[in-house]
């Protein structure tokens, strides 16, 4: 029998972090052993839905002095995410990251650290398996249509627009098509920005409001027909099968893997 994979969560007190801890506690072959969060005001956190408590520290370096996991799951944002990932790599701890806001330069730095140390990292903008499949299919469909719109909507607390997943979908579409899409440019735009952002001819639209978690919709257009692909995440639990899949995969990785599609064997597309 394979040993249990021990997991800690960075951002453990956040909504996603709390959900990851609960998922890890329920996942066969995985054991949560700690959490880190800058808002930590105690030395432990009780995992929601269980009677289990794990050590909690304000920083990963402090947590590693108490409990050093096999894998850290990180859903923090931007600069904090990069520093957390590099801290884990330097400590020999593998990382599954769902953080958005990492620049190409950040990703290259992470790639170099991972390759040099042999410590695996999985970075993905979306861990919902359906979103990964949508991205893969959108890349295929792009070969056969000249026009496309991409619409995404999220909860009102999301800090970036468009979403990292939307950008990954758009990149997969251009990769699949091999060229820019055709685009209708309005002669008269009475409300500036109505046509959305322009990504290689794809009109990209973002909505933010309460009551939503995540929705991505791709609409392709051709003479006399449209093709619509939609993925909805109704709650944060929708991401957990993908996160746990990443946890079990990254323990065997020795470099940076970008996109859950590459874990699933669906090619280069990268949510």
Question: Where are the predicted features?
Answer:
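Short glycine-rich anion-binding loops that position phosphate/pyrophosphate groups of nucleotides
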Residues: 78-79, 101-102, 126-127, 209
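Rossmann-like NAD(P)H-binding beta-loop-alpha module
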Residues: 133-145, 161
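Rossmann-fold NAD(P)-binding glycine/threonine-rich loop
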Residues: 83-86, 90-91, 99-121, 137-139
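C-terminal substrate-binding/catalytic lobe of Rossmann-fold NAD(P)-dependent oxidoreductases
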Residues: 3-66, 146-271
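Rossmann-fold NAD(P) dinucleotide-binding segment
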Residues: 64-71, 75, 79-97, 109
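Glycine/charged-rich beta-loop-alpha catalytic/anionic-binding loops adjacent to active sites
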Residues: 69, 94, 115-122, 222-229
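Structural motif
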Residues: 10, 75-76, 98-99, 124, ...
